[in-house]
């Protein structure tokens, strides 16, 4: 029987529910259990695909082409599992499916209401994740905080789950904040008490508390919280601010969190305890890196940390392999000119230009890429970065001064980058991109193929609607550009490289989505190797 763990939050947002859920998932997985992660978002958008990165941060893409919350990236990187369309559900998606059923007459004329129709659809999504993955444990994170109007249907649905699948198969974990008043040097438990009271008022008694705090919580405060919340003191877990993300699962294990979860849910795991030795080595390496490598990231959304979270994480993952800390210098593409690019790139060991949409900042990206190419600075382009590298090459090497992408200039004469043929007639923006996992055949003798361990074909995740225009392929090849990765039918250009450069590779896909702390993605690994000039150092 699948076990269901629901992670909720109270007091304030951004408490680290996703990290808590991921850390627990890692511990349970390392006990030999099959774990599936799930995130419920209470916003009315169908998915985050059309949301501004400044509003939502990065849009994560799953293998099956779902545009999802960035927390799914945390799940995949920390737990090392693959997520799917069942892993991210929004209020908008729930209402859309319910209304479609109503229009088809599936409800036989019934009055469609939040209870039972919306809550039933939410429960269906939870159980569908269990059925499609055959998992031992489903960990579902509920976005927002307890008491939010938007979260009410999700809270009601998970309350009903206890009756649907049996109390012995459901566990509620509630994350709250225990603030420290610096002036009084005193921790306050009242916010936690009120948050749990709010949760209990809708019929959910938490079975475990995870307390976010700046410093360790003494036994007296834990006893007080236990008394007021009716949660046994041994199931009150501290989540202290940590210097490294990798510390969190280890801190939870030290407090016996995974064992307490297994005991509560009567789980007999294949392994008596989580084997975290490899994780400890990773944590030790991350804290004691011996070198520094500076990478300049030129992007459109650099003001928001979360906008490129998978990219910056992938850079760090590669850095661990070379025992070097990656110092990422984020530069707003709009601010770059021919006059200041040399100053911006001063002391930089490499340039990365990640994905994005729209026309803003494109000329700055092109200027940065040109500087990297002419000065043989290792360069990695991703999605839009690959497209701008192609435009730069056409302008400066092929002397096609008006070369551009039709995203920026719809009627340009030399449309090096053009909209994909099957996307021309799409009227909607949302859900109309080339999304998900696609194969790329790698050319022998290229640095790209070497980066991927001499594989013939790789599978990578995409999110774009524009592509390289094939009518320019011959001219590019004659000028020295190598198309080192193409679709198996040779129709779509997936990877370009300049073989005479130290490292100049750009991919149409998003390699950052497949990077893991203990398994850096191939292009990132080779890019940091070239930028740092260091040998690999296994750990």
From Swiss-Prot:
Pathway: Pyrimidine metabolism; CTP biosynthesis via de novo pathway; CTP from UDP: step 2/2. The gene is pyrG. Keywords: ATP-binding, Glutamine amidotransferase, Ligase, Magnesium, Metal-binding, Nucleotide-binding, Pyrimidine biosynthesis. It comes from the Bacteria. Allosterically activated by GTP, when glutamine is the substrate; GTP has no effect on the reaction when ammonia is the substrate. The allosteric effector GTP functions by stabilizing the protein conformation that binds the tetrahedral intermediate(s) formed during glutamine hydrolysis. Inhibited by the product CTP, via allosteric rather than competitive inhibition. This is CTP synthase. GO terms for molecular function: ATP binding; CTP synthase activity; glutaminase activity; identical protein binding; metal ion binding. UTP binds at residues 13, 188-193, 224. Homotetramer. CTPSs have evolved a hybrid strategy for distinguishing between UTP and CTP. The overlapping regions of the product feedback inhibitory and substrate sites recognize a common feature in both compounds, the triphosphate moiety. To differentiate isosteric substrate and product pyrimidine rings, an additional pocket far from the expected kinase/ligase catalytic site, specifically recognizes the cytosine and ribose portions of the product inhibitor. Its EC number is 6.3.4.2. Residues 294-537 form the Glutamine amidotransferase type-1 domain. GO terms for biological process: 'de novo' CTP biosynthetic process; pyrimidine nucleobase biosynthetic process. CTP binds at residues 13, 148-150, 188-193, 224. Residues 1-267 are annotated as: Amidoligase domain. It holds the Pfam family CTP_synth_N. L-glutamine binds at residues 54, 356, 384-387, 407, 465. It is an enzyme of class 6 (ligase).
């Amino acid at each position: 029987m699948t076990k269901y763990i629901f992670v909720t939050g109270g007091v304030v947002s951004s408490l680290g529910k996703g990290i808590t859920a991921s850390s627990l998932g890692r511990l349970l997985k390392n006990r030999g259990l099959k774990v599936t992660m799930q995130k419920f978002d209470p916003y009315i958008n169908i998915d985050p695909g059309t949301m501004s990165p400044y509003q939502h941060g990065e849009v994560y893409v799953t293998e099956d082409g779902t545009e999802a919350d960035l927390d799914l990236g945390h799940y995949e990187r920390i737990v090392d599992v693959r997520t799917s369309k069942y892993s991210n559900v929004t209020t908008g998606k729930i209402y859309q499916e319910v209304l479609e059923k109503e229009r088809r007459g599936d409800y036989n004329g019934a009055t469609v209401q939040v209870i039972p129709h919306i809550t039933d659809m939410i429960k269906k999504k939870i159980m569908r994740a269990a059925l499609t993955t055959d998992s031992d444990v489903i960990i579902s994170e509920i976005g927002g905080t307890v008491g939010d109007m938007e979260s009410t249907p999700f809270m009601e649905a998970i309350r009903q789950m206890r009756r649907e699948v049996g109390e012995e198969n459901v566990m509620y974990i509630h994350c709250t904040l225990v603030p420290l008043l610096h002036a009084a040097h005193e921790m306050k438990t009242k916010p936690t008490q009120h948050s749990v009271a709010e949760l209990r008022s809708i019929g959910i008694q938490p079975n475990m508390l995870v307390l976010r705090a700046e410093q360790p919580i003494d036994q007296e405060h834990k006893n007080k919280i236990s008394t007021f919340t009716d949660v046994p003191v041994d199931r009150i877990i501290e989540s202290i601010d940590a210097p490294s993300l990798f510390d969190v699962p280890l801190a939870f294990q030290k407090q016996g969190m995974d064992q307490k979860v297994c005991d509560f849910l009567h789980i007999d795991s294949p392994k008596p305890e989580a084997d975290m030795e490899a994780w400890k080595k990773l944590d030790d390496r991350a804290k004691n890196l011996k070198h520094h490598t500076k990478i300049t990231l030129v992007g459109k959304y650099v003001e928001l940390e979360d906008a490129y979270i998978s990219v910056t994480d992938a850079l760090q993952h590669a850095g661990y392999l070379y025992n070097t800390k990656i110092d990422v210098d984020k530069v707003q593409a709009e601010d770059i000119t021919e006059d200041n690019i040399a100053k911006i790139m001063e002391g930089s060991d490499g340039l990365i230009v990640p994905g994005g949409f729209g026309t803003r900042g494109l000329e700055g990206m092109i200027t940065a890429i040109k500087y990297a190419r002419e000065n043989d600075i290792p360069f990695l382009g991703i999605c839009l970065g690959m497209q701008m590298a192609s435009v730069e090459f056409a302008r400066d090497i092929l002397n096609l001064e008006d070369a551009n992408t039709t995203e920026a200039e719809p009627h340009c004469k030399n449309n090096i980058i053009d909209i994909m043929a099957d996307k021309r007639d799409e009227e909607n923006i949302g859900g109309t991109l080339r999304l998900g996992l696609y194969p790329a055949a790698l050319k022998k003798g290229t640095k790209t193929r070497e980066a991927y361990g001499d594989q013939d074909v790789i599978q990578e995740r995409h999110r774009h609607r524009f592509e390289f225009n094939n009518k320019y392929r011959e001219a590019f090849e004659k000028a020295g550009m190598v198309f080192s990765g193409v679709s198996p039918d040779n129709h779509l250009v997936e990877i370009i490289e300049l073989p005479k450069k130290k490292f100049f590779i750009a991919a149409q896909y998003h390699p950052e989505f497949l990077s893991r702390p203990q398994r850096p993605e191939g292009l990132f690994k080779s890019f940091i190797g070239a930028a740092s000039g260091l040998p690999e150092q296994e750990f």
